[in-house]
Design a protein with these regions (language model features):
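Metallo-beta-lactamase
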Residues: 83-131, 138-139
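A short helix->loop->beta-strand "cap" motif at the edges of active sites that frequently abuts
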Residues: 31, 80-86, 195-199, 223
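Short beta->alpha connector loops
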Residues: 38-41, 92-94, 125-128, 149-152, ...
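Cap/insert and terminal regions of metallo-dependent hydrolase folds
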Residues: 152-233
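Active-site neighborhood of phospho(di)ester-bond hydrolases with catalytic His/Asp-centered motifs
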Residues: 34-38, 55-65, 89-90, 143-149, ...
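Metal-dependent catalytic neighborhoods of phosphoester/phosphodiester hydrolases
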Residues: 68-77, 98, 210-218
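Conserved beta-strand hairpin/beta-sheet module of binuclear metal-dependent hydrolase folds
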Residues: 1-47, 132-147, 164
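Active-site metal-binding motif and surrounding structural segment of the metallo-beta-lactamase
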Residues: 40-86
């Protein structure tokens, strides 16, 4: 699989950046899944493929920094003559989900399923709204994305042995409390270590943070950690 980072910021984009958006492509190129579609992601997606090339969209949750570009996506689908695009997303918050119900977006509940060559599995995680981590198995490899979450014990088993873990490092240590909705990069590193993953990529980077500071809090527990950057591609 190939993971392309379209946007890596949250809860708002950096200058010339974009919020959460990740394109996962099978080795054959026949299956392409867009995971999250926050502000600024749609234009970057079109550098990689057309909307006709998408097999599905997975929205980890319905906060705007993870789904706001689905609104112009609907306009693009209409212009491209695409009648239906499968979108897997939570049922709540209902008032946000209703925004997605018009047009060509065909909404499916968040549940385990096959999309083309990819097997998708989900885990409810610790965030103020209904939010899911996603595990994707394809081409003999396993990719896990935590979605937005504070510490969640079940993630260790869910991510066990993953070839790549893409984890929410939305906070630095000094900004974290148990009531906050995100992990720190150090927490991500300990999760990766305990789960025995091969590669850790830190994402959902607050634009006010220095990437070096984010990485510094992770490398003691997982020396191979890296900070996500928009535009990079990683072979899994």
């Amino acid at each position: 699989m190939i993971l392309t980072m379209l946007g890596v910021n949250g809860p708002y984009p950096s200058i010339k950046g974009a919020c959460s958006g990740y394109l996962l492509t099978s080795d054959s190129g026949r299956t392409r899944i867009l995971i999250d579609c926050g502000s600024g992601v749609l234009g970057r997606l079109l550098n990689e493929c057309t909307v006709r090339d998408l097999s599905a969209v997975v929205l980890s949750h319905l906060h705007f920094d993870h789904m706001s570009d689905m609104l112009p996506m609907n306009y693009l689908l209409s212009a491209a003559g695409v009648e239906c695009l499968k979108v897997i997303c939570p049922k709540t918050p209902e008032k946000v989900r209703r925004i997605l119900e018009d047009g060509a977006l065909d909404l499916y509940p968040t549940q385990d399923m096959m999309i083309g060559e990819m097997k998708l599995e989900f885990l409810r995680v610790a965030h103020p709204v209904e939010t899911y981590a996603v595990r994707v198995i394809c081409d003999g490899k396993t990719f896990v994305y935590t979605g937005d979450t504070n510490e969640c014990d079940a993630l260790t088993l869910f991510a066990a042995g993953a070839d790549l873990l893409l984890a929410d490092a939305g906070l630095l240590r000094d900004d974290w409390t148990i009531k906050k909705p995100h992990m720190t990069s150090g927490m991500c590193a300990r999760l990766a270590r305990d789960a025995g993953v091969k590669m850790l990529v830190l994402t959902h980077i607050n634009p006010s943070y220095n990437a070096e500071a984010v990485l510094d809090e992770a490398v003691n527990d997982f020396p191979e950690a890296m900070v996500a950057r928009a535009g990079i591609r990683i072979s899994i």
